[in-house]
Amino acid sequence: MYLQKFNLSGRTAVVTGGGRAIGLACSEALSEAGAQVYIADVDMAVAEEGRDALKQKGYAAEIAQMDVTDPDQVTAVAAEIAAARGGIEILVCNAGIARSETPAEEVADEHWLNVIDVNLNGVFWCCRAFGRHMLQAERGAIVNIGSMSGFIVNKPQEQSYYNASKAGVHHLTKSLAAEWASRGVRVNAVAPTYINTPLTAFAKANRALYDVWMESTPMGRMGEVDEIASAVLFLASDAASLMTGSVVSVDGGYTCW
C-alpha cells in the first residue's frame, strides 16, 4: 500500500534544467518511479546529454528546448507536451542560476535582472503555463526548487540577489498552493543546502569559504543530488497527497542555527 503511493506509472513529468546535476537526478528519480519524463532545457546539448545518461540506465526520456525566461515559449512547450501525452501531471521547476560574492552596492543591473528572470520569473512562467493544463484536469503536482538561501542569509559570501530570488520562489509556492488547492493541484518546494554540483565547485577551491560552510552545517557536509531528488520524488507522488504549500528543508540542519 505505502510503496504504491510512490508509483508514477502513466504520469508525465516535466523537469526544467533536467539534464544535469540536481535536475538530472530528479529526472532519473521520476523515471525510476515510472513517469514519462521530459527534460526541458534552453541548451539542447545539455538536454541530449541528460537523455543519453538516462538511456544508459534503461529510461526513455523525451527532450524539449525551452527557455524559462520566455513566457511565450514556455506556454507553447506546455501545450505541445500536453497534446502529445494527453496531459501533464508533474512539473519540477529546477532551472536556475547562481551568482555570489558581490556586495549589494556593486551588483550590476543586468546581473540582478538575470538572476530574478531565471530563478523567479522563470518559475512563475512555468507554473502558470503547465499549471493551466493541470487545472483543466483537476490533477497535478508541482515541485519548485528553492534554497535554504530563501530562509537565511548565507555567509561569508554576499549574494543578496540570489537570496531574494529564492525567497520569492518560496512565497510564490505558498501563494499558488493556496489558490489551487481546491482545484486538485498541489504546489510544494524543496530548499536545499549546498549541494555537490558544478555551481558549488568554486567553494572547494577556497578552503576558508568551504570551512565556514561546513562549520555552519550541523551535519558537517554538503548534500548530494540524489538527496534532493528523493525529496522531489516524495512531493511529486501520492505519498505527499496532503501536502501543499510546504517548503521542505533538505539542508543538513543548516537552518537550525
Where are these regions (language model features)?
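The beta1-alpha1 cofactor-binding region of Rossmann-like NAD(H)/NADP(H)-dependent oxidoreductases
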Residues: 44-45, 64-76, 109, 226-227
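A conserved structural motif in NAD(P)-dependent oxidoreductases
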Residues: 217-228, 239
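Substrate-binding pocket helix/loop in short-chain dehydrogenase/reductase
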Residues: 102-104, 108-116, 213
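Residue(s) in the substrate-gating loop at a strand-loop-helix junction
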Residues: 147
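Alpha-helical segment proximal to the catalytic Tyr-Lys
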Residues: 132, 178-182, 241
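Short C-terminal tail/terminal secondary-structure segment
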Residues: 1-5, 98-101, 232-233, 244-257
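Active-site helix of classical SDR
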Residues: 127, 165, 173
